[in-house]
């Protein structure tokens, strides 16, 4: 097994070295191909690709090769999407070939990388980046030449779309056809990456580092294997990229990031700066809503008009952002919410960040983001299942039996509240004298959840300081609620509540609550007056679990045991009440 792992590591290292030879460490240009919405012969919006008609044997060969490649790579592409890829990529390959020959370039020094994707908004598009790397050529001249190439490519595709558009709209007047072509040239399927120069007040082609763009941006996408998924369908560079698996892409991306980890967090690279293009058109399938580009629609003099609605610009995240996002994902996956958690579970990353400028601040920011993300996206039950490894639960079941509790019913009660399906009842109250296991169970649940906070009753002015953005809150040996009984009722009522915290902004409390107490907490003393006015509202928000039998567990119980036990729950919540006799073994005496 060890030898197989070594062989696999060597293979990936060789693959990484070979891929770096194919993708040069230099700058080129990048653009998107996007399907544009226009009107068909019935004045209805369409994204249909113009018919692929050509007398060029080279272009026909490119069409066939692209279709064969895409059909073999992914079965979730529609015929129209395949035709769009054939048209755009086929014209690109043919035009590159002509450009290389006319400029007498060495074709082996041309880098073209493309990737067909569907974004989170389900918009179909193709990423392309192109570079030419020859020591005998002036890089500035090469960039200008590549800029001219993109203009030519944009115009060629605009001509195809415009002619098709005019034909189906029966636009025959030369002047109207010229106007239509102008619109397609200005806002057609080709979208170069641009930046705005504040001095000249003009847009220029944005230089893109090919390796960074490929390894960091393109390789971060997952391959699409369902129709509703976002990610990439296929990718290629006429070499290794064509045949990489999703797992290999992720591994190579990590190797590239690790190679540059020395300056990855503070690199002076910001791809967002001035990145104002390409812009994605928010297109729908209804002729009565905002659709496509107004210039294209109006140029055809159709009855359908619309405003240009633009979504957010396509942005290329920086290395700094990618590294931070990678760290945040790792914290989420292993469950790190405090510096202590990170020291134990992600010690290398903690040490690396702590030695950087503003390192402690970065660490605290990432940990806070993970607290917010986890408490918002998943429940305490999900945390227990996600962050722990299963262990034999027999010692836990024996302890629960010794406490006089029915483990099957207790499991249903706990899971109903931990999944926040208990309605207004969002608090578990373990009640009983010392030595009965109430703190043992509460501590086990909180430690298994990992993202938990403690109610600091020692500071009555700010008891919730540690409770913001936690999946579960623990009030240990809770006595009198006093002046914060109203906050407690709001928090245990099942809603998200914001409360004041010491030295911080008001924080959102989203988690369920566990209380351990050997006194009757429904009797509240405010000042010198004890009152039962809050008793009924508190009972409506809590389920009381009486722990009356003294126990002496001889085996340590762990979060892994709790996961094994709770994971056998049938995922069906039950109706809860304040007192539930079904929780206890034998006849209740209270």
Swiss-Prot record:
A motif (RCR-3) lies at residues 217-221. Transmembrane segments: none annotated. A divalent metal cation binds at residues 117, 125, 127. SUPFAM superfamilies: P-loop containing nucleoside triphosphate hydrolases (SSF52540). ATP binds at residues 432-439. Multifunctional protein which displays endonuclease and helicase activities required for initiating and directing viral DNA replication. Also plays a role in viral packaging and transactivation of several promoters. Binds site-specifically to 2-3 approximate tandem copies within the origins of replication (Ori), unwinds this hairpin region and nicks one DNA strand thereby initiating the rolling circle replication (RCR). This is Initiator protein NS1. Residues 33-263 form the PV NS1-Nuc domain. The endonuclease active site can probably bind other divalent cations. Residues 405-560 form the SF3 helicase domain. GO terms for cellular component: viral replication complex. The active site is at 217 (for nuclease activity). The record marks 227-228, 285-286 as: Cleavage. Homooligomer. It is found in: Host nucleus. Changing residue 227 to E: Complete loss of viral replication competency. Changing residue 285 to E: Complete loss of viral replication efficiency. InterPro entries: ADV_NS1-3, Helicase_SF3_DNA-vir, P-loop_NTPase, Parvovirus_NS1_helicase, Parvovirus_NS1_N, PV_NS1-NUC. Its main location: host cell. It catalyses: ATP + H2O = ADP + phosphate + H(+). GO terms for molecular function: ATP binding; ATP hydrolysis activity; DNA binding; endonuclease activity; helicase activity; metal ion binding. A motif (RCR-2) lies at residues 125-127. Its EC number is 3.1.21.-, 3.6.4.12. Its cofactor is Mg(2+). Keywords: ATP-binding, Covalent protein-DNA linkage, DNA replication, DNA-binding, Endonuclease, Helicase, Host nucleus, Hydrolase, Magnesium, Metal-binding, Nuclease, Nucleotide-binding, Transcription, Transcription regulation, Viral DNA replication, Viral genome packaging, Viral release from host cell. It comes from Aleutian mink disease parvovirus (strain G) (ADV).
């Amino acid at each position: 097994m060890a030898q197989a792992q070594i062989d696999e590591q060597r293979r990936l290292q060789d693959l990484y070295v070979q891929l770096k030879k194919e993708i040069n460490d230099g700058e080129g240009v990048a653009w998107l191909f996007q399907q544009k919405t226009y009107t068909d012969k019935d004045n209805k919006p369409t994204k249909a690709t113009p018919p692929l008609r050509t007398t060029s044997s080279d272009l026909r060969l490119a069409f066939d090769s692209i279709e064969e490649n895409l059909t073999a790579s992914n079965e979730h592409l529609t015929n129209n999407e395949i035709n769009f890829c054939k048209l755009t990529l086929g014209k690109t390959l043919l035009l590159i070939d002509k450009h290389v020959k006319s400029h007498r370039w060495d074709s082996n020094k041309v880098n073209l990388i493309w990737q067909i994707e569907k974004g989170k908004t389900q918009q179909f598009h193709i990423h392309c980046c192109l570079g030419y790397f020859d020591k005998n050529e002036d890089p500035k001249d090469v960039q200008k030449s590549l800029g001219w190439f993109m203009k030519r490519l944009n115009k060629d595709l605009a001509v195809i779309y415009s002619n098709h558009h005019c034909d189906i709209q029966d636009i025959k007047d030369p002047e109207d056809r010229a106007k239509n072509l102008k619109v397609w040239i200005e806002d057609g399927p080709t979208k170069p990456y641009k930046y705005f120069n504040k001095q000249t007040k003009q847009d220029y082609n944005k230089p893109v580092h090919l390796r960074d763009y490929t390894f960091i941006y393109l390789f971060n996408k997952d391959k699409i294997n369902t129709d509703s998924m976002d990610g990439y369908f296929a990718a290629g560079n006429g070499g290794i990229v064509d045949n990489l698996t999703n797992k290999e892409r992720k591994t190579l991306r990590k190797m590239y990031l690790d190679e540059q980890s020395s300056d990855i967090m503070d690199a002076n690279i910001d791809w967002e700066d001035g990145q104002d293009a390409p812009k994605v058109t928010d297109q729908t399938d209804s002729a009565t809503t905002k659709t496509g580009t107004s210039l294209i629609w109006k140029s055809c003099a159709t009855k359908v008009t619309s405003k240009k609605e633009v979504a957010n610009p396509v942005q290329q995240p920086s290395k700094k952002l990618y590294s931070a996002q990678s760290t945040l994902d790792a914290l989420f996956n292993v469950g790190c919410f405090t510096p202590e958690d990170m020291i134990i579970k992600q010690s290398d990353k903690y040490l690396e960040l702590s030695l950087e400028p503003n390192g402690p601040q970065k660490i605290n920011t990432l940990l806070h983001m993970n607290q917010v993300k986890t408490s918002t996206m998943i429940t305490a039950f999900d945390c227990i299942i996600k962050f722990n490894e299963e262990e034999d639960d027999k010692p836990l079941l024996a302890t629960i039996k010794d406490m006089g509790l029915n483990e099957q019913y207790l499991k249903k009660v706990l899971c109903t509240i931990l999944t926040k399906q208990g309605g207004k009842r969002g608090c578990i109250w373990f009640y009983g004298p010392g030595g009965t296991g109430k703190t043992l169970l509460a501590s086990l649940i909180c430690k298994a959840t990992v993202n938990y906070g403690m109610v600091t009753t020692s500071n009555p002015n700010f008891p919730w300081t540690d409770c913001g953005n936690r999946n579960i809150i623990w009030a240990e040996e809770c006595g009198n609620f006093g002046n914060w009984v109203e906050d407690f009722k709001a928090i245990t009522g099942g809603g998200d509540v914001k409360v004041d915290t010491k030295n911080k902004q008001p924080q959102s409390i989203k988690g369920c609550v566990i209380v351990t107490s050997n006194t009757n907490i429904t009797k509240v003393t405010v000042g010198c007056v004890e009152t039962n006015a809050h008793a009924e509202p508190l009972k409506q928000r809590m389920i009381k679990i009486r722990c009356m039998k003294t126990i002496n567990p001889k085996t340590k119980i762990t979060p892994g045991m709790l996961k094994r036990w709770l994971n056998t729950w049938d995922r069906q919540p039950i109706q809860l009440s304040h007192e539930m006799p079904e929780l206890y073994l034998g006849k209740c005496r209270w």
